[in-house]
Regions:
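Short microdomains enriched in Cys/His and/or Lys/Arg
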Residues: 150-175
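Local cysteine-cluster metal-coordination motifs and their immediate loop/turn environment
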Residues: 133-146
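Short conserved catalytic/interaction loops centered on acidic-Pro-aromatic/His motifs
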Residues: 81-84, 99, 125-128, 146-152
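Solvent-exposed, charged helical/coil patches
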Residues: 1-12
Length: 175
């Protein structure tokens, strides 16, 4: 269990799993796989199944992963903790990638959050990816249903002006 910031002794080790916190300042909720640190200085750790991308100086976290852990850092900061870096652990390669929480990343993250909110309030759903190798590994594939959505969109375009019921499959040929 993660004690509120300031309640732990300055040298007390923190190791809390599956932490849920919110930020009133940023209107965000974060689920954090692991929070580790000492006293009120902590590091969020996010576990990913995949692998890091290859960077010029070695393994790097993907942009989406960097933004995710920055949200976690912002929420922790809003709850009184000091967060200077985050870690993404990639299970496929057993590598920990450290991410400094600097002003550039904070600005990028808040901009991403703002754009996500704008997209959500606009009510427009982005089109699904077509035959993307990312989809089967995505945690939202069961909600997004990219193949099914793309098929329905094709039928909807073909059926404009037609009052047929939309289906995923062509009706059987009549004998």
């Amino acid at each position: 269990e993660l004690l509120p910031a300031g309640e732990a002794a300055a040298d007390e080790k923190i190791h809390a799993r599956s932490v849920q916190l919110s930020s009133e300042t940023h209107k965000l909720i974060a689920g954090i796989d692991l929070v580790e640190g000492e006293g009120s200085v902590v590091t969020p750790v996010e576990y990913k199944r995949g692998r890091p991308r290859d960077g010029a100086e070695g393994p790097e976290a993907w942009d989406a992963d960097r933004v995710q852990v920055c949200v976690q850092a912002l929420v922790l900061r809003d709850n009184g903790f000091t967060v200077n870096e985050a870690v993404v652990y990639y299970d496929s390669t057993k590598q920990r990638v450290r991410i400094p929480i600097d002003e550039v990343l904070v600005t990028q993250t808040l901009d991403t959050v703002s754009r996500a909110r704008a997209a959500a309030t606009a009510g427009l759903i982005p089109p699904p990816l077509i035959d993307s190798p990312k989809c089967p590994r995505c945690s939202l594939v069961g909600i997004c249903l990219p193949d099914e959505t793309a098929a329905m969109m094709r039928f909807r375009q073909e059926a404009r002006g037609d009052d047929r019921q939309l289906t995923l499959f062509e009706p059987p040929e009549e004998a």
